[in-house]
Design a protein with these regions (language model features):
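Functionally important transmembrane alpha-helices
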Residues: 89, 96-152
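Juxtamembrane helix-loop-helix connectors linking adjacent transmembrane helices
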Residues: 1-58, 68, 73
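Membrane-interface helix/loop boundary segments of multi-pass membrane proteins
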Residues: 58-82, 109-116
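Transmembrane alpha-helical segments in integral membrane proteins
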Residues: 53-70, 157-165
Length: 182
């Protein structure tokens, strides 16, 4: 699930961030991206550790571990939306708000399906690492290319289908008072 979701989001909905940035600029705002001076293999490894590995582990432990567990008595959709909203707001970027929210919903369902935050951390790492590695090797993906978007949407549809086809592992009702949480 993790790789399918990460690739689908990056390719299928990556344009959402770019579109939001264009909107902010067209309204007179400024979008400040983070420029990482990845000029050597050592720097790439260091940046992968600091900007891909650590955030993936820490954020997934918090949002899909602690937050998701604290919402275990809530119905599945409101819990997914609350967790995703917290995740999106935490990132503090207006231009990435919608993308991060959708990403958070997907990561929530990965965690619920697997019973662990680890698969979501893998997807999170893949997403963050892809940005760094593509920057390092000089690959620029045209996120507005309809073939790239279509490919990503197909991957996302496959992810949704796989998650939805077997609901037996996903709790859809609030936990009973005497029921022990997983």
């Amino acid at each position: 699930y993790s790789v399918l979701f990460a690739a689908g989001m990056f390719l299928g909905l990556g344009f959402v961030n770019a579109l939001a940035a264009r909107l902010v600029v067209s309204l007179g705002g400024r979008v400040n991206g983070i420029e990482l001076p990845v000029e050597s293999p050592f720097a790439l490894i260091l940046f992968l550790f600091c900007y891909a590995f650590l955030p993936a582990i820490e954020e997934e432990a918090f949002f899909r571990g602690l937050i998701t567990e604290s919402l275990s008595r809530a119905k599945i959709v409101p819990a997914a939306f609350c967790s995703a909203a917290a995740f999106a707001l935490y990132h503090g970027s207006l231009t990435q708000l919608l993308y991060q929210f959708i990403y958070g919903v997907g990561l929530f369902f990965i965690a619920k399906k697997s019973g662990s935050a680890l698969p979501g951390a893998i997807a999170h790492f893949i997403n963050n690492a892809a940005v760094l590695v593509f920057s390092y090797v000089g690959i620029e993906i045209d996120l507005f290319n309809p073939f790239i978007i279509a490919g990503g949407v197909i991957l996302l549809a496959a992810f949704v289908w796989l998650i939805a086809r077997d609901k037996s592992d996903i709790k859809t009702e609030p936990a009973e008072k005497n029921e022990v949480s997983r």
